[in-house]
Amino acid sequence: MTRPVSYRKARRLAPMTTIIPATLSPRELAEEVRKLAVTPRDWMARVRLSAEGRWYERIHVDGQYEVWLISWLPGQATGFHDHGGSAGAFGVVFGALEEHQAGTPQRRHAVTAAPVSAGRIRSFGPEYIHDVRNTSEAVAVSVHAYSPPLAEMTRYDMIEGSLTRLDTEEAGQW
């Protein structure tokens, strides 16, 4: 008995890959913030003020990035925190904020403070740790963008010039 000849070509299968959505660079995030900051009429009606703490609302999210609105009464602050490996940018639309930038938990770094006035945008990479504060006497409103969307944030305290990790919050806990 003769067996039929098979002409099936052997195929090599490519290794399985995980598709990771492209992320935006700090510069691209700053551009997204700028676009929203110049059109407050499109979102200003959503802003609220809260004496209990900063008010915030996520106004955009997709696989690449997310955007938040945040309002700040005088004296409100974030405390030192990172962005869980996400890059970011923020811009002040109304009022003024003050940003205190620190190093990393592994590296001692002098804290630097810089004013961020209306119209100014700050952008940063994925290992950035900072504390943003409203040290003025007026309300402030800011726009924040992160890529990839925030999955977690770690909070820190500055003790004797070194960052000490306090806790990590996952998305949905804030």
Mark where each language-model region is.
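Glycine- and acidic-residue-biased ligand/ion/polar-headgroup-sensing regions
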Residues: 74, 85-103
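Ligand-binding loop in jelly-roll beta-barrel domains
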Residues: 117, 126-152
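N-terminal leader/capping segments at the start of a protein or of a new domain
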Residues: 1-41
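Short acidic-glycine-tyrosine-enriched beta hairpin
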Residues: 89, 103-130, 168
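A short glycine-rich, His/Asp/Glu-containing loop-to-beta-strand
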Residues: 45-76
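Conserved short histidine dyad/triad with adjacent acidic residue
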Residues: 68-83, 125-127
